């Protein structure tokens, strides 16, 4: 599994300093600067402290079973083209070295609904999907809230949370501009 994050810090240097500070108790395998430079901080086979509490596809302890990639971005602006190019190249390499399918490339928000929002609404998931580097959207039969919860769980959203948090989290990835009550379009997950 690969978990994509944004740093939510002023710049890459500040993020790198924090990610390498043992007292901060946070780390990731990689940091990709907005220039496209890739910095490896933890070996891929080693555990990093990037995911925290959460679950994806029925699996917990995400830190022990994933590679964390931090993107130098505050979460409020578009991701640089050079950064996305570098991310695509890095993901291709990781997916060649490890048994990570496109369905295993997720955002921090996907596995920690309500607790995390990264990589955020500005992240271009469709770009990764077109390259086969993230799972394409699946269409589920529209229905009521119970049907939606079942569909979301089938898509991987198994972390415990209330309905509104689940809806917000799935929209963050598939339709961050959508608001209001559950609708048929929300069943594209």
Task: State each model region's role.
Residues 1-103:
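Active-site-adjacent loop/helix surface patches within enzyme catalytic domains
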Residues 75-189:
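Basic/polar, cationic surfaces and motifs that engage anionic cell-wall
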